[in-house]
């Protein structure tokens, strides 16, 4: 089942012609959800060149090809579903309201026939040359091996830009869309309505933005304005965020954008348990999240495509030390709480991203993300992206991108990380703030220590300021209690900053940069992505980054104090698996 959402708001450019593309690629059926995003009733009528089934609360009907139909979307009725027949490729509709009684054209087009380029990207399926594992070093074998985890083939990496500083991380996204960076004064003033000069902006065919959060704050508004510019020029935009973390103003900003420009397609991810599912699965509906981080811009001009991956979300906490004053902008979020379980929380996070400009790699990562975008809507299953093919020649690429959906791929990411840790011979260097290891990852740590592999961890044991910070701190202390006398654990101690980077380096030649936390959530609950690089030269570039984290940290005392209530709570495996 392919499911896409068309957001309708009578106040969103009410007289402008609009086009919405839907995809039935490799799907047995298609559902187009018409979602009311405004405060005015909407009337829709027209014809399609194929049979169309319509389902609304309390009623349903089927319309023959070329037969006119009419439906209304009241304010109180949040959605109506359209089910186009496989032969249907086009609908010519008019959308009217009290604001535009004459109506405005709305065209629905099937992507497979209307846009061969995006269809080719979305249907890409790569053959990966895999060298004979006989005689290979174990780390190399693990890197090139095929597994159930969704991975690209080994790719060229070029010379990626390493984005350690927060402004550099945000400006990389800005430059990919605007063609130039924002000056320091723009961040100092923190005005989300600042003038933006689009004279150097690239001409883009596709924008992918995948993030845990897309907040209505300075960062989110600037990104929304950049995307809006390209949407007005006809660029196809695909945005993926987590529904359970979006607040009212976040939703309003994104829904308004998608309503004004239907070429901006929005997926708000929410995992739903089966009817009658056990209690723990019902509860996990509240905290399973889409944690894949990527901005990919595919440009028409050579050399201007970019992809950025890592740990940062679209949230001011990744850019500013403290909340900026947005009271002049009532439609933006003014943050308040700095601890607990409130969605109004604010932390200042130290994170790490990587920007890649190699055009083949950018396109490959965008195509890989399409497997998530076009996942089966009912099961969350995604099609494979690559297939291994035995090769005598050594692959030229040094980097592989992965995407994990642990509750659908049999915890394949956990198995991959276990393999990587098991292959370590000398040293493992880790930067990660969340240290609630799964049992299998813990056994891999124990095995590495038994082999006398040196493990160094730069973490953030005290996670006060993060959402649920007190619980996360207790879990980190349990890690220190277990491993403090065997692992060199250091606490990142930049003042009032919460570590958020996720880096793992093995034997001075393999580097993983990802969204993956070393906790149960990442391996059991959340979708994740990252890049694994097997290249000593790239490790040499990353080593100063790691040393900078070490320089901003101090050794952790092993005599931690953990309250009895937390010990009792986390003695239950089900509770630990939730964090």
Where are these regions (language model features)?
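Short, solvent-exposed loop/linker segments at beta-strand-coil boundaries, enriched for Pro/Gly
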Residues: 48-54, 58-60
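Long, C-terminal catalytic modules of enzymes
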Residues: 495-579
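Short, hydrophobic beta-strand segments
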Residues: 72-86
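Edge beta-strands of extracellular beta-sandwich domains
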Residues: 100-111
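Extracellular ectodomain segments of secreted/surface proteins
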Residues: 2-46, 50, 69-71
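Acidic, glycine-rich loop-and-beta core segments that form the ion-binding/anion-interacting portion
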Residues: 414-427, 442-450
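A short beta-strand micro-motif common to beta-rich folds, especially ectodomain repeats
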Residues: 80, 89-97
């Amino acid at each position: 089942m392919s499911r896409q959402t068309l957001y309708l708001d009578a106040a969103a450019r009410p007289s402008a012609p609009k086009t919405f593309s839907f995809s039935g690629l490799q799907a047995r059926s298609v559902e187009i959800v018409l979602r009311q995003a405004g405060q005015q009733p909407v009337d829709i009528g027209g014809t399609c060149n194929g049979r169309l089934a319509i389902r609304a609360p309390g009623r349903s009907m089927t319309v023959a090809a070329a037969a006119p139909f009419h439906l209304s979307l009241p304010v109180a009725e949040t959605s109506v579903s359209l089910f186009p027949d496989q032969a249907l490729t086009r609908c010519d509709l008019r959308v009217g309201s009290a604001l535009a009684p004459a109506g405005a054209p709305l065209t629905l087009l099937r992507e497979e026939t209307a846009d061969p380029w995006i269809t080719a990207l979305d249907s890409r399926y790569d053959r990966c040359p895999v060298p004979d594992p006989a005689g290979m070093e174990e780390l190399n074998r693990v890197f090139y091996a095929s597994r159930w985890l969704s991975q690209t083939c080994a790719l060229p990496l070029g010379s990626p830009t390493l984005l350690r500083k927060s402004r550099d991380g945000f400006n990389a996204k800005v430059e990919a869309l605007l063609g130039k960076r924002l000056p320091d004064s723009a961040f100092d003033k923190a005005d989300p309505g600042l003038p933006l000069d689009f004279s150097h902006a690239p001409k883009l065919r596709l924008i992918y933005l995948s993030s845990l959060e897309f907040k209505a704050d300075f960062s989110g508004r600037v990104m929304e304005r950049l995307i809006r510019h390209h949407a007005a020029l006809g660029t196809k935009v695909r945005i993926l965020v987590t529904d359970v973390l979006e607040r009212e103003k976040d939703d309003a900003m994104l829904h308004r954008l998608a309503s004004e420009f239907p070429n901006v397609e929005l997926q708000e991810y929410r995992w739903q348990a089966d009817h009658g599912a056990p209690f723990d699965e019902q509860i996990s509906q509240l905290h399973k999240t889409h944690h894949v981080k990527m901005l990919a811009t595919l440009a028409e001009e050579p050399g201007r495509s970019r992809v950025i991956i890592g740990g940062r979300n679209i949230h001011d906490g990744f850019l500013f030390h403290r909340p900026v004053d947005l009271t002049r902008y009532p439609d933006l979020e003014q943050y308040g709480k700095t601890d607990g379980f409130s969605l109004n929380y604010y932390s200042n996070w130290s994170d790490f991203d990587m920007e890649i400009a190699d055009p083949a790699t950018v396109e490959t990562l965008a195509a890989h993300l399409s497997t998530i975008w076009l996942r089966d809507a009912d099961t969350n299953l995604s099609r494979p992206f690559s297939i291994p093919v035995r090769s005598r020649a050594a692959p030229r690429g040094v980097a592989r991108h992965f995407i994990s959906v642990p509750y659908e791929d049999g915890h394949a990411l956990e198995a991959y990380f276990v393999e990587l840790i098991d292959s370590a011979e000398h040293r493992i260097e880790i930067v990660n703030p969340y240290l609630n290891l799964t049992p299998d990852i813990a056994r891999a740590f124990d095995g590495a220590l038994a082999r006398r592999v040196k493990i160094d961890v730069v973490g953030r044991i005290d996670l006060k300021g993060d959402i649920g910070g007190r619980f996360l701190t207790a879990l980190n202390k349990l890690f220190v209690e277990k491993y403090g006398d065997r692992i060199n654990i250091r606490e990142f101690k930049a003042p009032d900053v919460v570590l958020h980077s996720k880096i793992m380096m093995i034997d001075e030649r393999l580097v993983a940069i990802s969204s993956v936390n070393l906790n149960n959530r990442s391996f059991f609950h959340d979708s994740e992505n990252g890049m694994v690089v097997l290249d000593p030269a790239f490790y040499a570039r990353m080593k100063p980054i790691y040393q900078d984290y070490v320089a901003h940290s101090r050794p952790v005392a092993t005599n931690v104090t953990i309250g009895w209530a937390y010990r009792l709570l986390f003695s239950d495996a089900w509770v630990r698996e939730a964090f």
